[in-house]
Curated annotation (Swiss-Prot):
Keyword presence, S-adenosyl-L-methionine: yes
One Pfam family recorded for the sequence: GidB
Binding-site positions, S-adenosyl-L-methionine: G78, F83, A129, E130, R148
Similarity section: Belongs to the methyltransferase superfamily. RNA methyltransferase RsmG family.
Protein's UniProt name: Ribosomal RNA small subunit methyltransferase G
GO molecular function, one term: rRNA (guanine-N7-)-methyltransferase activity
Cystine pairings recorded for this chain: none
Location of the region described as Disordered in the Swiss-Prot/TrEMBL record: 218-237
Enzyme Commission number(s) of this protein: 2.1.1.-
Domain of life assignment: Bacteria
Keyword Cytoplasm: yes
UniProt cross-references to CDD domains, sorted A to Z: AdoMet_MTases
InterPro entries assigned: rRNA_ssu_MeTfrase_G, SAM-dependent_MTases_sf
Amino acid sequence: MKPEVFYKTLADQGIQLTDQQKHQFHRYFQLLVEWNEKINLTAITEESEVYLKHFYDSIAPLLQGHIQNEPLRLLDIGAGAGFPSLPMKIIFPQLDVTIIDSLNKRINFLHLLAEELELEGVHFYHGRAEDFAQDKNFRAQFDLVTARAVARMQILSELTIPYLKLHGKLIALKASSAEDELTQAKNALNLLFAKVIENHDYTLPNGDPRTLTIVEKKKETPNKFPRKAGMPNKRPL
């Protein structure tokens, strides 16, 4: 997907990018490739692949109408090089985006990226999702949490649901169908007082399969969740 095709595909779906937004995506691509030689950010570095499999893939929740250009607080867990939240932030600048990542080198990249792209209302923190979720400045403070190919729902739900406000939503992007995952996650979702409200498969323009799952927080999360760092992975709920 060449940049021009990316712009046209968005325009066809009602999103007209400004010259500034086009420049932001172009600079994002350049910095991603440049920094990828120093630290491992992505295996995808060819321009048309980055525009398709990182930029276009990341904005599926926008294209499908799940996120609007409103001053919502969005947390991205394990965003790596900023996906999916920063492409969404470029298109919908009103979003207030927070990223937590366990690797400090990636956080350094994100700080530089945000400065270069002149993004405002973005916040980056180095650490584990399990730890920040017990901090009152983070717990139950977000309207939305996004996660792209981070972990199975059984694990992901414990890492993310505590951050949501009541009736806030987790938006999980996956590369394959999530049906089996959701069956395995039933117990975790029950314990966390959360419910799957949408789950559907779709394809990228090149035919690659994708799944988008939305989980809503129905009641306050019990204080014991999430458990200590490493436990959700070691012993899923």
